[in-house]
Structures are given as structure tokens and as C-alpha cells.
């Protein structure tokens, strides 16, 4: 799979109906994937969004992130099989690790994120075959589970969302591909892909069959500074108290050159002083310039090309604001 995708789900002002409409428009313009991010920020849920998108489109590959443990693996497999049926076999899934921060958010006891992700993926894949299966792991345990309907496909691709070195290695070991995080530079992407590629090789798997996708934050305006300001809020979310513990350090350890350790305390102090507004104001232009594709149409095209040059096969583009969505589709139409 190669090409350009369209991403939604992070903007709290965009309704499910609006998301589905933009997915349809993306399909009309030759985009290859529509992707929804179900986030720890408690925006819209993935099942509702993908049902709407599935009914609004006919050819677009559709996918979403879903954090494991929040849903039982049987429920996740059942939902995935149902959505794959609804869409005529167009689904991919990005099951993500339940970090300690996620566990705290959802009132769960912390359990090893790599272990739970691996077991959820293994269990879901077995259930998706349509056979009667039992699974007994450290965390996941069930007997005699079988879908009561024949799945459209017995294997739906899993693009594992990963940010840290551990997550990237795990994606190479168990995924059909990887979905690299948003708010990352092309330099980070190149480093991350090298880690994944090594893990694929060590697992004895075929790199040619592996899919590399990434959500790329895009902000298109006629004025460069205005484009930076439109997407600065999304960069800031990666440094709020919810996401900071599992985002900043892991990205730096992979080699993200635009996050400076000395800035972390500044972001924390800004949040304590004035919440989201103060945090957004504290994010330097260099962060926005480096870790998003923001600027004029030509500047954004050039930046997205740098992600492809780094090895990303499917650049999944997410507009920073609703008023930019149409322009993004026009700029990147096939």
C-alpha cells in the first residue's frame, strides 16, 4: 500500500457526520486511506466514526487506533469483523499499547504494555479466523470463542501504532505494518523506521510485505506564520499532563531532534500557570516547524515529501482545522 491518506479524530470541533463527509471527499480525490485517531483525550469514539465513514465511502481503506485493555479482545475482534463486513473488506486496525498513563486514565491496574498488546493482537487474530479458539496468556484468557458469522476476511492488517523504541520493535515483531505517531519530524521517522526494519529482520519476516504509515499534521495557509499558529495547539497536546509522560521521553530516545529536554519544565510550568492556553503559547515555532507540515501549499507539499523520503509509504494527512480540510484535499488530490 502506498499513497496519501486523510486523518480525523483529533479535532474536538469536528462531528462524526463531518468526518464521514470528509472521508467521502478524500475518496473522490484519490486518497487511499481514511484514518481515525481514538485518543486518550476522550474525543469521539472509533466505532461510531468508522461506521459513519464506512457507509459514506466505497473504496477507501479505513482504519483507526484502539487502545487495548479498554475493550476486551473478543469485543475488539467482533467489532473489527463487523466493520470489515460493513465496508466490504476495507478495514485495517491499529491496536495500541495501554501505557500506565492510559491505565490510570481508564481506572485500570497497570500491567506490562508490551505483554498486553502482544496478547491482544494474538487473541484477536485467532478469533478473526472464524474458528473456535481458546487463548491462555499472562493476561488474556478465554475458552471456546467463535464468531457466530463468517468474517469477510480471516486476516485484517494490523498497523501497530508505536512511538518508543520498545513499541517500534514490537510493531516489527507482530504487526503487518506500523502507524507512526503524529507530531514527529521526518528525522524521527527515519530513525523509527530503521528500528522497525531491524526488528522485522530479527523476527525473520519479509520487509517487502511490511506497511509503513504515519499520521502527518498539516496546516495550510497563505501566510506561513498563520499556518504555524493553526497547528500549534496540536503540538501542545503532546506536552500536556496527559500525554507528556509517554510521548516526550520516548520520542527523544528514538532521536527526535526538535524536542529539547530543557523545555519540558517550561511546558509543565506553563500548564500549571494557565492551562491549555498558556501551554500553546509556550510551544516554540521550532517545534511546530520541525514536527508538522505547516506553511503555504508548496511548503506543505515539500515537507510531506520529506516524510516519504524518510521511508513512509502512506502519509496520512490530518488538517489542523476544519477550514483547512478542503484545501488539503485539493492540494494532495491524485
Predicted regions and their residues:
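Acidic (Asp/Glu)-rich catalytic clusters
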Residues: 24-28, 50-59, 80-91, 172-173, ...
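Hydrophobic faces of well-ordered beta-strands that scaffold small-molecule active sites
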Residues: 2-8, 34-36, 61-66, 91-95, ...
Amino acid at each position: 500500500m502506498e499513497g496519501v491518506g486523510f486523518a480525523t479524530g483529533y479535532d474536538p470541533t469536528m462531528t462524526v457526520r463531518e468526518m464521514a463527509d470528509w472521508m467521502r471527499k478524500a475518496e473522490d480525490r484519490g486518497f487511499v486511506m481514511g484514518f481515525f485517531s481514538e485518543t486518550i483525550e476522550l474525543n469521539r469514539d472509533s466505532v461510531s466514526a468508522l461506521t459513519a465513514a464506512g457507509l459514506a465511502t466505497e473504496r477507501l481503506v479505513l482504519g483507526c487506533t484502539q487502545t487495548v485493555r479498554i475493550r476486551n479482545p473478543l469485543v475488539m475482534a467482533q467489532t473489527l469483523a463487523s466493520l470489515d463486513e460493513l465496508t466490504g473488506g476495507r478495514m485495517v486496525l491499529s491496536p495500541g499499547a495501554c501505557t500506565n498513563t492510559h491505565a490510570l486514565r481508564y481506572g485500570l491496574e497497570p500491567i506490562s504494555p508490551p505483554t498486553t498488546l502482544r496478547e491482544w493482537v494474538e487473541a484477536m487474530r485467532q478469533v478473526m479466523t472464524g474458528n473456535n479458539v481458546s487463548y491462555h496468556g499472562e493476561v488474556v484468557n478465554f475458552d471456546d470463542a467463535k464468531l457466530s458469522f463468517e468474517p469477510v476476511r480471516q486476516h485484517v492488517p494490523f498497523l501497530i501504532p508505536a512511538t518508543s523504541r520498545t513499541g517500534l520493535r514490537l510493531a516489527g515483531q507482530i504487526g503487518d505494518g506500523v502507524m507512526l505517531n503524529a507530531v514527529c519530524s521526518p528525522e524521527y521517522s527515519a530513525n523509527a523506521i530503521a528500528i522497525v526494519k531491524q526488528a522485522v529482520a530479527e523476527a525473520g519476516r519479509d520487509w517487502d510485505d511490511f506497511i509503513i504509515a504515519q499520521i502527518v499534521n498539516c496546516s495550510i495557509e497563505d501566510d506561513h506564520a498563520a499556518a504555524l499558529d493553526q497547528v500549534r495547539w496540536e503540538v501542545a497536546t503532546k506536552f500536556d499532563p496527559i500525554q507528556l509522560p509517554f510521548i516526550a521521553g520516548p520520542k527523544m530516545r528514538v532521536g527526535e531532534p526538535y524536542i529539547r529536554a530543557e523545555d519540558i519544565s517550561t511546558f509543565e510550568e506553563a500548564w500549571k500557570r494557565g492551562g491549555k492556553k498558556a501551554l500553546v503559547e509556550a510551544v516554540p515555532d521550532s517545534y511546530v516547524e520541525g514536527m508538522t507540515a505547516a506553511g503555504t501549499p508548496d511548503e506543505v507539499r515539500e515537507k510531506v515529501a520529506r516524510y516519504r523520503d524518510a521511508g513512509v509509504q502512506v502519509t496520512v494527512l490530518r488538517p489542523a482545522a476544519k477550514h483547512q480540510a478542503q484545501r488539503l484535499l485539493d492540494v494532495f488530490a491524485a
